[in-house]
Amino acid sequence: NYIYYFLVAKYMADNMHCKTGVDNIMNLCENIHDDQKANILIFIAHHIKNPQFVEATQLALMSALDNQKPVSLSKDDDYYKLLNEICESLKQEIIKPTEQIDPEKEREKILKRRDENERLVSNEKVNPNSLPIEIQNMNKSLRSIEVVGQIVKNRQGSLPKPDIKTMVMEMYGAAFRTIGYFGAIIESEREHVVEDVINNKNEGASNNEIIKKIDSFFELTSLNFCLFVFSKVINAVGSKELRSTFSQIAEEIGTPAAKLVSFSIISCFSKIAIPELEDLVEDLRDNPVAMSIIRARVRSYLYNNHVNFSDRQKIINTVNLNPRDSHIVANKPSRKSR
């Protein structure tokens, strides 16, 4: 598949100087919800520096779910209300106090799970145009994020910094609209699901118990989808060279969601600056949803990076993972890193 995508992308990039070539690129952008077309666009991004290509992919990104209100994860946000209860219950997630952690092994586990998931997805042959329109709309947005992210990564040294910043901000916007779109679907379907389950229930469980379990399912699904979309942005555009850009965007957008994405990117691709973490926690301390995501991100950071004992203690205390973590040991260095 990769050889096919590479050759098709090279051919299309070499022929973009003519009208037919431009039309072909535009067709790919209009049908970016199709995985095959999106993959070709990602490969084209390796070959081409044509401004028309950059503009076409940006347009696809900006137009994706453009009528949808983006999530903010502020307390008055509808999506926040979907997540609040389950995030309250996750407050006590901890890192085991005496656990020896090998970051290399932890990263290997993550990569293995990712490969398994990709293999399962690649084995499923589905006509993208036969999927429900809601799925197509979300796929268009998510695939646009991947393509524009590839352009940013490839051309961060040649494109003007304001252009890079604009493109990344559009990626944030598309991600937040996608999450909002999913939340609207969840809200619209919840009552139908509750009604169907109650009407077809077996004796035993009360209606209140059923509603509670369904609500928990929707809350967990909503949280997982939010983190999934955040991870799309992180993987698409993550780069330690753009650290200052991510910080600027978080400040300009100003929402908890933007601050969480920027913090997540920075912690994935460079070292956590403890003063910055302290400022973020101080800003979002009263937001259980944001704090739950910060703790999850910090936990991942500590499991996947070598962090000395002193910094580890400061980070744990800053996010208040658990009082018992005052005795946590530093990461165990692997033989390879000695």
Please place each PLM-identified region on the residue numbering:
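Charge-dense, extended regions
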Residues: 166-174, 180-338
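Hydrophobic repeat-domain scaffold segments
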Residues: 2-6, 10-204, 229, 233
